[in-house]
Amino acid sequence: MKRLLVCAVALIDSDGRVLMAKRPEGKTFAGLWEFPGGKVEEGERPEAALIRELKEELGIDVTESCLAPLTFASHTYSDFHLLMPLYVCRRWKGIPRGLEGQQLKWVIAKDLRALPMPPADVPLIAHLEELL
């Protein structure tokens, strides 16, 4: 079975809210909410991939020193196994915007469970609830 490494981030604002992104139509899991991030390319470090993805998807600049690993998801889908480290980031430059057609929403931790999410994302919520 194919293994896929995807990095994700919980961007946390000064009010303790987490930024969530809604997958746009035409993509796998369209309409579901997820933590921003993306695939790690061959030979790429996870932190570098996350910095690249945040610039491409949200138009924000993040430095590696602002990324703190929190937990990870390990989930088997029908055709691949996903490994997804989740980082926390509380400092970035710029205002997050959905540059790839995705809707964005700031959510307090206790409301995360109300959002429909891909199965791999759901277990990560408990770690954020504990943190926040």
Residue ranges of predicted features:
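Generic C-terminal helix-cap and adjacent flexible tail
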Residues: 1, 129-132
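Conserved N-terminal beta-strand and adjoining loop/helix that marks the start
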Residues: 1-18, 39
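Active-site-adjacent beta-strand/loop module that shapes the phosphate/pyrophosphate-binding cleft
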Residues: 4, 13, 71-95, 105
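Conserved Nudix-box catalytic region and its N-terminal flanking loop in Nudix hydrolases
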Residues: 17-56
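HhH-family (HhH-GPD) DNA N-glycosylase catalytic core used in base-excision repair
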Residues: 51, 60-61, 131
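A short coil-to-beta-strand element that immediately follows conserved catalytic motifs
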Residues: 61-71
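NUDIX/MutT-family hydrolases
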Residues: 86-90, 96-128
